[in-house]
Swiss-Prot record:
InterPro entries: L-lactate/malate_DH (IPR001557), Lactate/malate_DH_C (IPR022383), Lactate/malate_DH_N (IPR001236), Lactate_DH/Glyco_Ohase_4_C (IPR015955), Malate_DH_type3 (IPR011275), NAD(P)-bd_dom_sf (IPR036291). Gene3D superfamilies: Lactate dehydrogenase/glycoside hydrolase, family 4, C-terminal, NAD(P)-binding Rossmann-like Domain. Belongs to the LDH/MDH superfamily. MDH type 3 family. Substrate binds at residues 83, 89, 121, 152. It comes from the Bacteria. Catalyzes the reversible oxidation of malate to oxaloacetate. Keywords: NAD, Oxidoreductase, Tricarboxylic acid cycle. The lineage of its organism: Bacteria, Pseudomonadati, Pseudomonadota, Alphaproteobacteria, Hyphomicrobiales. Transmembrane segments: none annotated. HAMAP family: Malate_dehydrog_3. This is Malate dehydrogenase.
Length: 320
Protein backbone atom coordinates (compact mmCIF):
# COMPACT_ATOMS: atom_id res chain seq x y z
CA UNK A 1 0.00 0.00 0.00
CA UNK A 2 1.47 3.33 -1.07
CA UNK A 3 2.00 5.80 1.74
CA UNK A 4 0.03 9.03 1.62
CA UNK A 5 1.84 12.23 0.71
CA UNK A 6 1.27 15.43 2.67
CA UNK A 7 2.59 18.69 1.23
CA UNK A 8 3.01 21.65 3.56
CA UNK A 9 3.27 25.02 1.82
CA UNK A 10 5.08 27.30 4.25
CA UNK A 11 7.69 25.97 6.69
CA UNK A 12 7.22 28.52 9.46
CA UNK A 13 5.98 27.82 12.97
CA UNK A 14 2.71 26.22 11.85
CA UNK A 15 4.37 24.34 8.98
CA UNK A 16 6.98 22.79 11.24
CA UNK A 17 4.38 21.81 13.83
CA UNK A 18 2.17 20.29 11.11
CA UNK A 19 5.13 18.25 9.85
CA UNK A 20 5.87 16.91 13.31
CA UNK A 21 2.22 16.03 14.05
CA UNK A 22 1.80 14.31 10.66
CA UNK A 23 4.70 12.03 11.57
CA UNK A 24 3.57 11.34 15.13
CA UNK A 25 0.11 10.42 13.83
CA UNK A 26 1.54 8.27 10.99
CA UNK A 27 -0.51 10.12 8.38
CA UNK A 28 2.05 9.74 5.60
CA UNK A 29 5.27 11.13 4.15
CA UNK A 30 5.81 14.86 4.36
CA UNK A 31 7.24 17.42 1.97
CA UNK A 32 7.84 20.89 3.38
CA UNK A 33 7.88 23.72 0.83
CA UNK A 34 9.11 27.24 1.49
CA UNK A 35 10.54 30.04 -0.63
CA UNK A 36 13.24 30.51 2.04
CA UNK A 37 15.60 27.81 0.77
CA UNK A 38 17.19 25.77 3.55
CA UNK A 39 14.38 26.29 6.05
CA UNK A 40 12.12 23.45 4.82
CA UNK A 41 15.13 21.15 4.36
CA UNK A 42 16.43 21.95 7.85
CA UNK A 43 13.09 21.50 9.60
CA UNK A 44 12.42 18.29 7.66
CA UNK A 45 15.81 16.86 8.66
CA UNK A 46 15.35 17.90 12.29
CA UNK A 47 11.95 16.19 12.52
CA UNK A 48 13.23 13.10 10.67
CA UNK A 49 15.97 12.84 13.30
CA UNK A 50 13.31 12.83 16.03
CA UNK A 51 11.53 9.88 14.40
CA UNK A 52 13.84 7.16 15.81
CA UNK A 53 13.10 8.45 19.32
CA UNK A 54 9.34 8.73 18.82
CA UNK A 55 9.10 5.61 16.67
CA UNK A 56 7.52 6.78 13.42
CA UNK A 57 8.63 6.05 9.87
CA UNK A 58 7.45 9.05 7.87
CA UNK A 59 9.87 10.25 5.20
CA UNK A 60 10.63 13.98 5.21
CA UNK A 61 11.90 16.23 2.46
CA UNK A 62 12.19 19.98 2.02
CA UNK A 63 12.02 22.01 -1.18
CA UNK A 64 11.78 25.48 -2.67
CA UNK A 65 10.32 24.29 -5.96
CA UNK A 66 6.62 23.54 -6.34
CA UNK A 67 7.38 20.41 -8.39
CA UNK A 68 8.16 18.72 -5.03
CA UNK A 69 4.44 18.71 -4.09
CA UNK A 70 3.55 16.62 -7.18
CA UNK A 71 0.92 13.99 -6.46
CA UNK A 72 0.23 15.13 -2.89
CA UNK A 73 -2.91 13.66 -1.31
CA UNK A 74 -3.26 16.59 1.07
CA UNK A 75 -1.85 20.11 0.79
CA UNK A 76 -1.91 22.39 3.84
CA UNK A 77 -1.21 26.05 3.15
CA UNK A 78 0.30 28.26 5.85
CA UNK A 79 2.44 30.49 3.61
CA UNK A 80 2.13 34.23 4.15
CA UNK A 81 2.86 36.73 6.89
CA UNK A 82 1.46 36.26 10.41
CA UNK A 83 -0.11 38.93 12.58
CA UNK A 84 1.90 41.21 14.83
CA UNK A 85 0.48 43.04 17.88
CA UNK A 86 -1.99 45.75 16.88
CA UNK A 87 -2.80 44.08 13.55
CA UNK A 88 -6.10 42.48 12.66
CA UNK A 89 -6.24 39.43 10.41
CA UNK A 90 -7.65 41.74 7.73
CA UNK A 91 -4.49 43.89 7.69
CA UNK A 92 -2.65 41.01 5.99
CA UNK A 93 -4.84 40.92 2.90
CA UNK A 94 -2.63 42.67 0.33
CA UNK A 95 0.55 40.71 1.06
CA UNK A 96 -1.07 37.31 1.51
CA UNK A 97 -3.25 37.61 -1.60
CA UNK A 98 -0.07 37.66 -3.71
CA UNK A 99 1.14 34.58 -1.85
CA UNK A 100 -2.15 32.76 -2.56
CA UNK A 101 -1.74 33.47 -6.28
CA UNK A 102 1.68 31.78 -6.33
CA UNK A 103 0.48 28.88 -4.17
CA UNK A 104 -2.70 28.42 -6.23
CA UNK A 105 -0.68 28.21 -9.44
CA UNK A 106 1.66 25.66 -7.84
CA UNK A 107 -1.25 23.47 -6.69
CA UNK A 108 -3.01 23.74 -10.06
CA UNK A 109 0.15 22.61 -11.87
CA UNK A 110 1.44 19.91 -9.53
CA UNK A 111 -1.30 18.70 -7.14
CA UNK A 112 -4.69 19.34 -8.77
CA UNK A 113 -6.28 16.28 -7.12
CA UNK A 114 -5.23 17.07 -3.57
CA UNK A 115 -7.50 17.93 -0.66
CA UNK A 116 -6.39 21.43 0.29
CA UNK A 117 -6.60 23.03 3.73
CA UNK A 118 -5.86 26.76 3.95
CA UNK A 119 -4.70 28.35 7.21
CA UNK A 120 -3.39 31.69 5.89
CA UNK A 121 -5.19 34.80 7.20
CA UNK A 122 -7.52 36.57 6.65
CA UNK A 123 -8.77 33.01 6.38
CA UNK A 124 -12.18 33.21 4.71
CA UNK A 125 -10.94 35.56 1.97
CA UNK A 126 -7.66 33.69 1.41
CA UNK A 127 -9.34 30.28 0.97
CA UNK A 128 -11.77 31.93 -1.49
CA UNK A 129 -8.87 33.41 -3.47
CA UNK A 130 -6.89 30.15 -3.32
CA UNK A 131 -9.84 28.27 -4.82
CA UNK A 132 -10.05 30.82 -7.64
CA UNK A 133 -6.30 30.76 -8.36
CA UNK A 134 -6.05 26.94 -8.19
CA UNK A 135 -9.29 26.07 -9.98
CA UNK A 136 -9.90 23.29 -7.45
CA UNK A 137 -13.29 21.66 -7.03
CA UNK A 138 -14.79 23.65 -4.10
CA UNK A 139 -15.49 20.32 -2.35
CA UNK A 140 -11.73 19.70 -2.21
CA UNK A 141 -10.69 22.91 -0.49
CA UNK A 142 -11.54 24.18 2.98
CA UNK A 143 -10.30 26.76 5.45
CA UNK A 144 -9.13 25.94 8.96
CA UNK A 145 -10.96 28.22 11.36
CA UNK A 146 -13.86 26.73 13.28
CA UNK A 147 -11.95 23.72 14.62
CA UNK A 148 -9.45 26.12 16.20
CA UNK A 149 -12.05 28.63 17.42
CA UNK A 150 -14.16 25.79 18.86
CA UNK A 151 -11.07 24.31 20.56
CA UNK A 152 -10.34 27.67 22.19
CA UNK A 153 -13.95 27.89 23.42
CA UNK A 154 -13.77 24.28 24.69
CA UNK A 155 -10.55 25.04 26.57
CA UNK A 156 -12.09 28.06 28.30
CA UNK A 157 -15.24 26.10 29.17
CA UNK A 158 -13.33 23.08 30.52
CA UNK A 159 -11.23 25.41 32.67
CA UNK A 160 -14.32 27.20 34.00
CA UNK A 161 -16.13 23.95 34.85
CA UNK A 162 -13.05 21.95 35.95
CA UNK A 163 -13.96 19.09 33.61
CA UNK A 164 -12.10 17.20 30.89
CA UNK A 165 -11.90 18.98 27.54
CA UNK A 166 -12.96 15.66 25.98
CA UNK A 167 -16.42 16.06 27.49
CA UNK A 168 -16.89 19.60 26.19
CA UNK A 169 -18.26 20.20 22.70
CA UNK A 170 -18.40 23.69 21.31
CA UNK A 171 -19.74 25.18 18.16
CA UNK A 172 -18.19 28.25 16.55
CA UNK A 173 -19.44 29.29 13.11
CA UNK A 174 -19.10 32.26 10.76
CA UNK A 175 -15.97 34.03 9.57
CA UNK A 176 -12.60 33.59 11.29
CA UNK A 177 -12.49 37.08 12.73
CA UNK A 178 -13.84 39.20 15.55
CA UNK A 179 -17.40 38.64 14.22
CA UNK A 180 -17.23 34.83 14.58
CA UNK A 181 -20.33 33.22 16.06
CA UNK A 182 -19.86 30.94 19.10
CA UNK A 183 -23.23 29.15 19.38
CA UNK A 184 -23.83 28.72 23.09
CA UNK A 185 -26.99 26.61 22.94
CA UNK A 186 -25.32 24.05 20.64
CA UNK A 187 -22.30 23.80 22.97
CA UNK A 188 -22.40 21.18 25.71
CA UNK A 189 -20.67 19.51 28.63
CA UNK A 190 -21.34 15.75 28.52
CA UNK A 191 -24.35 16.48 26.32
CA UNK A 192 -25.82 19.12 28.67
CA UNK A 193 -26.30 22.42 26.78
CA UNK A 194 -24.56 25.48 28.24
CA UNK A 195 -27.82 27.40 28.93
CA UNK A 196 -28.90 24.46 31.13
CA UNK A 197 -25.58 24.57 32.99
CA UNK A 198 -26.24 28.24 33.76
CA UNK A 199 -29.66 27.28 35.18
CA UNK A 200 -27.98 24.49 37.19
CA UNK A 201 -25.69 27.09 38.77
CA UNK A 202 -22.44 25.80 37.22
CA UNK A 203 -21.64 29.26 35.88
CA UNK A 204 -23.28 32.63 35.29
CA UNK A 205 -24.48 34.19 32.06
CA UNK A 206 -21.90 36.96 32.57
CA UNK A 207 -19.04 34.45 32.78
CA UNK A 208 -20.36 32.64 29.71
CA UNK A 209 -20.55 35.91 27.77
CA UNK A 210 -16.96 36.68 28.81
CA UNK A 211 -15.77 33.27 27.52
CA UNK A 212 -17.56 33.88 24.21
CA UNK A 213 -15.81 37.23 23.90
CA UNK A 214 -12.44 35.71 24.85
CA UNK A 215 -12.96 33.08 22.12
CA UNK A 216 -13.59 35.83 19.55
CA UNK A 217 -10.37 37.56 20.60
CA UNK A 218 -8.45 34.30 21.23
CA UNK A 219 -5.98 34.70 18.38
CA UNK A 220 -5.23 38.30 19.29
CA UNK A 221 -4.61 37.33 22.92
CA UNK A 222 -1.80 35.02 21.79
CA UNK A 223 -0.41 37.55 19.28
CA UNK A 224 -0.17 40.13 22.08
CA UNK A 225 1.60 37.67 24.39
CA UNK A 226 4.08 36.34 21.79
CA UNK A 227 4.75 39.79 20.28
CA UNK A 228 6.66 38.26 17.34
CA UNK A 229 4.00 36.21 15.57
CA UNK A 230 0.77 34.31 16.05
CA UNK A 231 -0.46 30.98 17.41
CA UNK A 232 0.86 27.77 15.88
CA UNK A 233 0.36 24.70 18.09
CA UNK A 234 -3.45 24.77 18.21
CA UNK A 235 -3.86 25.88 14.55
CA UNK A 236 -1.61 23.01 13.42
CA UNK A 237 -3.44 20.45 15.58
CA UNK A 238 -6.75 21.68 14.13
CA UNK A 239 -5.61 21.32 10.51
CA UNK A 240 -4.20 17.85 11.22
CA UNK A 241 -7.61 16.76 12.59
CA UNK A 242 -9.16 17.88 9.29
CA UNK A 243 -6.48 16.15 7.18
CA UNK A 244 -6.83 12.94 9.17
CA UNK A 245 -10.60 12.87 8.64
CA UNK A 246 -9.99 13.09 4.88
CA UNK A 247 -7.10 10.60 4.69
CA UNK A 248 -8.84 7.99 6.88
CA UNK A 249 -12.38 8.69 5.62
CA UNK A 250 -13.44 9.28 9.23
CA UNK A 251 -16.40 11.47 8.25
CA UNK A 252 -15.91 13.76 11.23
CA UNK A 253 -18.31 16.66 11.67
CA UNK A 254 -16.05 19.70 11.94
CA UNK A 255 -16.69 23.44 11.66
CA UNK A 256 -14.63 24.65 8.68
CA UNK A 257 -14.70 27.45 6.14
CA UNK A 258 -16.51 25.71 3.29
CA UNK A 259 -17.87 26.89 -0.06
CA UNK A 260 -21.58 27.62 0.21
CA UNK A 261 -23.99 27.43 -2.71
CA UNK A 262 -27.17 28.71 -1.07
CA UNK A 263 -26.89 27.07 2.35
CA UNK A 264 -27.49 29.54 5.19
CA UNK A 265 -28.62 32.01 2.52
CA UNK A 266 -25.02 32.42 1.31
CA UNK A 267 -23.83 31.80 -2.23
CA UNK A 268 -20.29 31.83 -3.60
CA UNK A 269 -18.39 32.46 -0.35
CA UNK A 270 -16.34 30.33 2.04
CA UNK A 271 -17.89 30.63 5.51
CA UNK A 272 -17.39 28.64 8.72
CA UNK A 273 -20.13 26.01 8.99
CA UNK A 274 -20.28 22.40 10.23
CA UNK A 275 -19.25 19.98 7.49
CA UNK A 276 -18.57 16.27 7.14
CA UNK A 277 -15.04 15.56 5.87
CA UNK A 278 -14.50 12.14 4.28
CA UNK A 279 -12.56 10.60 1.40
CA UNK A 280 -14.43 12.79 -1.12
CA UNK A 281 -13.58 16.02 0.69
CA UNK A 282 -16.55 18.06 1.86
CA UNK A 283 -19.24 15.36 1.80
CA UNK A 284 -22.02 17.26 3.52
CA UNK A 285 -22.76 20.76 4.74
CA UNK A 286 -24.78 20.66 7.95
CA UNK A 287 -27.40 23.41 8.15
CA UNK A 288 -28.44 24.20 11.71
CA UNK A 289 -31.42 26.35 12.66
CA UNK A 290 -30.58 29.78 14.04
CA UNK A 291 -32.50 31.93 16.48
CA UNK A 292 -33.12 35.51 15.28
CA UNK A 293 -30.17 36.73 17.37
CA UNK A 294 -27.83 34.01 16.06
CA UNK A 295 -28.92 34.70 12.48
CA UNK A 296 -28.13 38.40 12.93
CA UNK A 297 -24.65 37.54 14.28
CA UNK A 298 -24.02 35.07 11.45
CA UNK A 299 -25.15 37.59 8.80
CA UNK A 300 -22.85 40.23 10.29
CA UNK A 301 -19.98 37.75 10.07
CA UNK A 302 -20.86 36.93 6.44
CA UNK A 303 -20.89 40.64 5.59
CA UNK A 304 -17.38 41.02 7.04
CA UNK A 305 -16.18 38.19 4.78
CA UNK A 306 -17.97 39.73 1.78
CA UNK A 307 -16.08 42.97 2.42
CA UNK A 308 -12.75 41.13 2.43
CA UNK A 309 -13.59 39.28 -0.79
CA UNK A 310 -14.51 42.58 -2.45
CA UNK A 311 -11.16 43.98 -1.27
CA UNK A 312 -9.40 41.01 -2.92
CA UNK A 313 -11.22 41.74 -6.18
CA UNK A 314 -10.12 45.36 -5.90
CA UNK A 315 -6.47 44.34 -5.48
CA UNK A 316 -6.43 41.67 -8.21
CA UNK A 317 -8.70 42.28 -11.21
CA UNK A 318 -8.39 38.62 -12.27
CA UNK A 319 -10.57 37.68 -9.26
CA UNK A 320 -13.41 40.07 -10.12
Amino acid sequence: MARKKIALIGAGQIGGTLAHLAGLKELGDVVLFDIADGVPQGKGLDIAESAPVDGFDAKYSGASDYSAIAGADVVIVTAGVPRKPGMSRDDLIGINLKVMEAVGTGIKTHAPNAFVICITNPLDAMVWALQKFSGLDPKKIVGMAGVLDSARFRHFLAEEFSVSVEDVTAFVLGGHGDDMVPLVRYSTVAGIPLPDLVKMGWTTQEKLDAMVERTRKGGGEIVNLLKTGSAFYAPAASAIAMAESYLKDKKRVLPCAAYLTGQYGVDGLFIGVPIVIGENGVERIVEVAFSAEEKAMFDKSVNSVKGLVEACKGINAALA
